[in-house]
Regions:
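Domain-level recognition of nuclease-like catalytic cores that cleave nucleotide substrates
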Residues: 217-261
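Accessory nucleic acid-recognition modules appended to NTPase machines
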Residues: 1-167
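Residues at alpha-helix caps and immediate loop-helix transition turns in enzyme cores, especially N-
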Residues: 166, 199-203, 235
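Conserved helix-loop functional segments at active or binding sites
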Residues: 139, 143, 206, 210-214
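Conserved catalytic cores of phosphodiester-cleaving nucleases, focusing on short active-site segments
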Residues: 137, 166-176, 181-194, 204-206, ...
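Acidic/glycine-enriched edge-of-secondary-structure segments
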Residues: 153-162, 187-201
């Protein structure tokens, strides 16, 4: 946030390189701002930008081609996807710097940061932490979830009985087999700035039950909580009693994933 450092302008330079030759540059910037603000579905982006979803196909495709925007399929809902910004520096710029650029240039970084800290945690750190957890889960040894992971992703499960939806941040599937139901090795929830409790395990257990009803094999599914803050005593006690409950802390994500845990 210091105008005197090279990194202060880096995000603006990166974006300028990508959109200088493009028409309607403001729309491209608006699309990125929408995703950075947490609108990660096509409909959500369209609502934020004030355009029809069909009108944004070209802009989304261009950002995907540059590699700055990544489209990830919902692993539980065919044809549904969500977008994320691939470069955390761009997310930081859109969430923290760009809205208060004038104040930053005037040297009021402390004021800007005080106002932006909560948004930074929710819209930059949170999504990036989820991505790190999925990358970690993709590389773990077979003894973590009972088999080497196949596909790893995220998805939403409709809970009609409770009139809600359950977001699964880290869904780990066994490698595809020729026959039989698709086996889920782990269902996980990731929280950067919140102490996790038994409520998070209960939600994952409910998700496993719903998926079993949809034909998935959840007989050996691990329920995994990933936290950047920690876990309360009750959930730690539950994990000590039940080997199918895994608690992954920030330090665990940086342990070599070669099975030497």
């Amino acid at each position: 946030l210091d105008p005197g450092t090279p990194l202060f302008l880096e995000a603006r330079y990166l974006l300028a390189e990508e959109v200088t030759a493009l028409r309607e540059a403001s729309i491209y910037h608006s699309v990125l701002a929408a995703v950075a603000a947490g609108n990660n579905t096509r409909g959500g982006i369209a609502s934020h930008v004030g355009r029809k979803a069909s009108d944004l196909t070209h802009y989304l495709n261009v950002w995907e081609d540059t590699g700055l925007l990544v489209r990830e399929e919902d692993v539980f809902r065919s044809g549904r996807s969500r977008y994320r910004i691939a470069e955390p520096l761009i997310s930081f710029y859109e969430v923290v710097s760009r809205p208060q650029w004038g104040r930053l240039e005037a040297g009021h970084a402390e004021t800007v940061w005080a106002d932006a800290k909560a948004r930074f945690a929710a819209q930059v750190l949170g999504p990036h932490f989820e991505t790190l957890c999925r990358r970690w889960a993709q590389l773990v040894a077979a003894d973590m979830f009972g088999a080497l992971p196949g596909e790893v992703g995220a998805g939403v499960i409709a809970d009609a009985a409770n009139r809600t939806q359950i977001q699964v941040d880290v869904a780990v599937f066994a490698p595809a087999e020729r026959s039989g139901p698709r086996r889920i090795l782990s269902l996980g929830e990731a929280k950067w700035g919140k102490t996790m409790t038994l409520a998070h395990i209960d939600r994952l257990r409910r998700a496993a039950h719903l998926l079993e009803g949809r034909g998935y094999d959840t007989s050996t599914t691990r329920l995994t909580c990933y936290s950047g803050t920690g876990f309360d005593e009750d959930i730690r006690a539950a994990a000590a009693r039940d080997a199918r409950i895994h608690l992954i802390e920030l330090a665990d994500l940086y342990v070599p994933v070669d099975g030497s845990r």
